[in-house]
């Protein structure tokens, strides 16, 4: 029988179209009415099976909470010890960035919080993160990372999350239960440029919020209405917010913030991360042991959830890249969920892959595990944890580069009293 051949050009074209999820045949749309879709047999192995880890040494920094790629070789990170730094993934070099202070920096006395969020605007010309005061919003210009301004008169508690809703407007979500809308005007930007030209010392403006809205508190304990995570739907100009009382809130977010709805989440413990999949029109919400997929246009009983099988450690980070949802856990695991096939990647990996396999509902799923990192054997460790030989590093943050072939992963030990760090490049 004649052998069927495929030209190398066609093979190359097909391979170039695959992201980290690889090729899975024809793409199916998400069925919003019943949340069911045909399970697709993979026809090509996902790229994530071939990822290998290279750890970075971060010295004595404590727990990396946030990260974003700046370009093909630099990642900016924020830590629990309130350090903002850039790591060069080719050389491993660490460069610390000065953090921005309030008008009255002497009033800041909040240890143990740090930088929980870093976000780039759509044009990648501005970066928003926390300031020296964890209640304040700091804006830097890219690619230089020159300071632009600080929003220091809004929140009364730590900023947990940030989302850009346009090139000049960002929203911050705080532990005080409020969401602040901030605008970086042309006037602020031009004055920032002129100040840098006149001064060799970093100078920056102080801005006030354009709007400050509290999330609804009528159905729950007001003390637990902390805004933990934000994600923006640019197509509909809608902002999703998750609060620690187990609710999802949706806001219209353009020139101001207008509440659209609030709904109780099916799994409402430790809802600390949120991502939006534009192609799928769903929000992914992480909880103690589940990832829930929420379409605000559908009834709440249509919410689909999948279990990570790592109970107790929590889902600490979640992201969309094409049809693959990457899940970082408190046990130091990276799991990969195929939203088209509606299952975790579970085919037997090739011999050359770097990863472990874990049982899930009778089948095997791919689980990549973070490396050893660094742990401070301080007094807390000696008094309470010295008999435990190994602590997994919680995946507090992860992000793909623009090509989808490099995955930066960072975090640290899960117990709040332990001091340590982990950062690695999987490629």
Curated annotation (Swiss-Prot):
InterPro entries assigned: Beta-prop_DCAF12 (IPR056151), DCAF12 (IPR051191), WD40/YVTN_repeat-like_dom_sf (IPR015943), WD40_repeat_CS (IPR019775), WD40_repeat_dom_sf (IPR036322), WD40_rpt (IPR001680)
Pathway it works in: Protein modification; protein ubiquitination
Gene Ontology molecular-function annotations: ubiquitin-like ligase-substrate adaptor activity
Disulfide bonds: none
Record's subcellular location: Cytoplasm; Cytoplasm, Cytoskeleton, Microtubule organizing center, Centrosome; Nucleus
Superkingdom to which the source organism belongs: Eukaryota
Keywords recorded for this protein, A-Z: Cytoplasm, Cytoskeleton, Nucleus, Repeat, Ubl conjugation pathway, WD repeat
Pfam families, A to Z: Beta-prop_DCAF12
Family: Belongs to the WD repeat DCAF12 family.
Assembly and binders: Component of the DCX(DCAF12) E3 ubiquitin ligase complex, at least composed of CUL4 (CUL4A or CUL4B), DDB1, DCAF12 and RBX1.
Protein name in UniProt: DDB1- and CUL4-associated factor 12
Species of origin: Gallus gallus
Gene name linked to the record: DCAF12
């Amino acid at each position: 029988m004649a052998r069927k051949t495929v030209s190398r050009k066609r093979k190359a074209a097909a391979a170039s179209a695959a992201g980290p999820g690889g090729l899975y045949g024809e793409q199916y749309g998400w069925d919003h009415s019943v949340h069911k879709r045909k399970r697709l047999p993979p026809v090509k192995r996902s790229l994530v099976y071939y990822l290998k880890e290279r750890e970075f040494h971060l010295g004595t920094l404590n727990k990396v909470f946030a990260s974003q790629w700046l370009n093909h070789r630099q990642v900016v990170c924020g830590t629990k010890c309130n350090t903002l730094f850039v790591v060069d993934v080719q050389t491993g070099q660490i460069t610390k960035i000065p953090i921005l202070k309030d008008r009255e920096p002497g009033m800041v006395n909040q240890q143990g919080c740090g930088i929980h969020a870093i976000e780039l605007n759509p044009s990648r010309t501005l970066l928003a993160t926390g300031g020296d005061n964890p209640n304040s919003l700091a804006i830097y210009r890219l690619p230089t990372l020159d300071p632009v301004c600080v929003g220091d008169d809004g929140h009364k508690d730590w900023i947990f999350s940030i989302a850009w809703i346009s090139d000049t407007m960002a929203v911050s979500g705080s532990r005080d239960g409020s969401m602040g809308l901030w605008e970086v005007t042309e006037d602020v930007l031009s004055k920032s440029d002129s100040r840098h030209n006149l001064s060799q010392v970093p100078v920056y403006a102080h801005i006030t919020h354009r709007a400050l809205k509290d999330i609804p508190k009528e159905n729950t304990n007001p003390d637990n209405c902390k805004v933990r995570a934000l994600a923006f739907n640019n197509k509909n100009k809608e902002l999703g917010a998750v609060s620690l009382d187990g609710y999802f809130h949706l806001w219209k977010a353009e020139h101001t913030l207008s509440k659209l709805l609030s709904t109780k989440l099916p799994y409402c413990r430790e809802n600390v991360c949120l991502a939006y999949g534009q192609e799928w029109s769903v929000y992914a919400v992480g909880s103690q042991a589940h990832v829930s997929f929420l379409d605000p246009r559908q009834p709440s009983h249509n919410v689909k959830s999948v279990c990570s099988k790592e109970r107790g450690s929590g889902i600490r980070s979640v992201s969309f890249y094409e049809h693959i949802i990457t899940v970082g856990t408190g046990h130091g695991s990276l799991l990969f969920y195929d939203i088209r096939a509606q299952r975790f990647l579970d085919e037997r990996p090739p011999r050359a892959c770097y990863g472990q396999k874990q049982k899930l509902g009778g089948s095997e799923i791919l689980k990549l595990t973070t490396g050893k990192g660094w742990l401070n054997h301080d007094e807390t460790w000696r008094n309470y944890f010295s008999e435990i030989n190994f602590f997994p590093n919680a995946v507090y943050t992860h992000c793909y580069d623009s090509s989808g072939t490099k995955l930066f992963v960072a975090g640290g030990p899960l117990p709040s009293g332990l001091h340590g760090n982990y950062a690695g490049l999987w490629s």
